[in-house]
């Protein structure tokens, strides 16, 4: 979607969120947004042209492209609820692809003080790397604007 920031039209991801989470972002408690590594979010976050190049690079034993190299360069998220009774625009610090591993969960702990998944990774520890679930972590920077979040 396109939104206006400082008089300029810019691209933004449109994500649905509960109001309580939006309030946590406004209050500085929530610093990362987690989304499933699913077809819906892959279509939203991944640049299809870059992904084709990534697929070719996987066949090369010396290939160095990572899945993160295929992510779109979008700088903002437009959060709202289904009814659009409120909105919150946040600048994106970064987007990364994580796996449900102890190491990746520790990165989220350290970088974002995020602990919602602390007890989840253990159920996947005996799986192969290909079987371990992946997910997106969108690091949140500054709140650009908000409307209707605070009643």
Stretches found by the model and what they are:
Residues 2-151:
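Structured alpha/beta reader/binder surfaces that contact nucleic acids or chromatin modification marks
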């Amino acid at each position: 979607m396109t939104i206006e920031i400082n008089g300029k039209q810019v691209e933004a991801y449109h994500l649905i969120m509960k109001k309580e989470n939006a309030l946590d972002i406004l209050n500085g408690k929530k610093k990362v947004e987690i989304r499933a590594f699913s077809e819906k979010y892959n279509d939203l976050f991944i640049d299809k042209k870059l992904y084709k190049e990534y697929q070719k690079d996987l066949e090369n034993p010396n290939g160095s492209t990572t899945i993160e190299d295929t992510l779109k360069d979008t700088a903002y998220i437009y959060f709202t609820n289904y009814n659009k009774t409120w909105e919150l625009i946040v600048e994106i610090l970064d987007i990364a692809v994580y796996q449900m591993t102890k190491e990746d969960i520790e990165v989220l702990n350290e970088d974002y003080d995020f602990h919602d998944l602390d007890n989840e990774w253990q159920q996947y520890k005996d799986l192969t790397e290909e079987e371990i679930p992946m997910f997106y972590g969108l690091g949140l920077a500054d709140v650009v604007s908000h409307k209707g979040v605070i009643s």
